[in-house]
């Protein structure tokens, strides 16, 4: 069994004829998010996918097998929801609520696409959006720092968080040498002369001497 262990960077230009002759590996989105996978090429050949951790494959990516042969990635048709709305505000609200749930979304012209989910379909309908179930390739937006399928409970979430923290530090953090020198000299000189002349007799007459008139 051949092993596929490299992805050619998108900015590397390959001869169109060379890529066209390469066998195709057609995968649904969920499978394209896995760096370790037993898969079958469209030719029927079984292969092992062993890519760097956190790799998310996209339609059109070109991979390299251990024998140097090329393999082309294609996004499979799968069950999706097409989300449209009567106005921009409703579509924006839909996108906000989906993002709040860390839902992978493909953004189109006046349309959002996401993996089929009846619960989300109901939520979006309640927001005023129009939902259509379809069978189509799904290629959601990548994360702002290069990720794809990342949630708070995923191991790869830590990678995005670390990158985000690095960007923040570069712009606002350690490199700016903010010497905040928080020396709070609280010389409040609290002279609380309460004159608590507590005559703890039977009547406990508290002579506090606060001068409250």
Swiss-Prot record:
One of its GO terms (biological process) is urea metabolic process. One of its GO terms (molecular function) is nickel cation binding. It is found in: Cytoplasm. SMART domains: UreE_N. CDD domains: UreE. InterPro entries: UreE, UreE_C_dom, UreE_N, UreE_N_sf. Residues 182-200 have a biased composition (Basic and acidic residues). Residues 170-213 are annotated as: Disordered. One of its GO terms (cellular component) is cytoplasm. SUPFAM superfamilies: Urease metallochaperone UreE, C-terminal domain, Urease metallochaperone UreE, N-terminal domain. Keywords: Chaperone, Cytoplasm, Nickel, Nickel insertion. Belongs to the UreE family. This is Urease accessory protein UreE. It comes from Burkholderia thailandensis (strain ATCC 700388 / DSM 13276 / CCUG 48851 / CIP 106301 / E264).
């Amino acid at each position: 069994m051949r092993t596929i262990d490299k992805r050619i960077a998108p900015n590397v230009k390959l001869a169109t004829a060379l890529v066209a002759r390469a066998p195709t590996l057609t995968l649904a989105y969920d499978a394209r998010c896995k760096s370790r996978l037993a898969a079958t090429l469209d030719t029927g050949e079984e292969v092992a996918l062993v890519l760097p951790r956190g790799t998310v494959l996209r339609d059109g990516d070109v991979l390299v097998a251990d024998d140097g042969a090329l393999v082309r990635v294609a996004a499979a048709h799968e069950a999706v929801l097409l989300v449209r709305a009567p106005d921009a505000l409703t579509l924006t609200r839909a996108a906000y609520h989906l993002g709040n749930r860390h839902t992978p979304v493909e953004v189109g012209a006046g349309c959002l696409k996401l993996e089929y989910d009846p619960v989300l379909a109901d939520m979006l309908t309640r927001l005023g959006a129009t939902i259509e179930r379809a069978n189509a390739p799904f290629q959601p937006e990548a994360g702002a720092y290069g990720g794809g399928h990342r949630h708070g409970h995923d191991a790869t979430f830590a990678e995005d968080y670390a990158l985000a923290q690095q960007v923040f530090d570069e712009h606002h953090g350690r490199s700016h040498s903010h010497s905040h020198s928080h020396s709070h000299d609280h010389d409040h000189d609290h002279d609380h002369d309460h004159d608590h002349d507590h005559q703890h007799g039977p009547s406990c007459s508290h002579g506090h001497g606060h001068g409250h008139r």
